[in-house]
């Protein structure tokens, strides 16, 4: 196996994103720092890859360093089944300003097949993500 070494944190992040896209679990494990590995990494990665379709990557910021670096990015994806956050949020008004305080996570909402899809495609759910 001829593996190139990333020259920056950004380059490694981009290559790991590509590995997620093509399902290269070996590379993902190989490029995960040993101190941060867990026994179930392989199974979690396999499940993620099976249930996720990656749509695109946008790097927002890269702060390089000699021994440490950071990369801020957004990865766009669809998951099967799709994920949702259903929350009951609490707010408080102080000094005339509404502020979010906290919230409770609630069970997922079941979507009707005849509702418009959550992705704003203007298609009904049954003809879009509900297939």
Residue ranges and their predicted role:
Residues 16, 20-27:
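Short helix-adjacent coil turns
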Residues 1-15:
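Short, low-complexity N-terminal intrinsically disordered segments enriched in polar/charged residues
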Residues 22, 30-62:
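Short solvent-exposed beta->alpha transition segments
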Residues 23, 33, 70-72, 92, ...:
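Long C-terminal interaction/binding lobes of large macromolecular proteins
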């Amino acid at each position: 196996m001829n593996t190139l070494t990333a020259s920056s944190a950004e380059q490694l992040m981009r290559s790991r994103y590509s590995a997620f896209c093509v399902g290269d679990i070996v590379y993902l494990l190989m490029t995960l720092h040993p101190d941060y590995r867990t026994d179930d990494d392989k199974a979690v990665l396999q499940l993620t890859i099976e249930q996720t379709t990656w749509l695109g990557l946008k790097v927002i910021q890269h702060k390089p360093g000699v021994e440490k670096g950071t990369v801020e990015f957004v990865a766009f994806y669809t998951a099967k089944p799709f994920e949702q956050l259903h929350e009951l949020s609490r707010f408080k008004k102080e000094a005339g300003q509404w502020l979010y305080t906290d919230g409770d996570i609630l069970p997922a909402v079941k979507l009707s097949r005849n509702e418009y899809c959550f992705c704003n495609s203007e298609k009904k759910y049954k003809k879009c993500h509900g297939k």
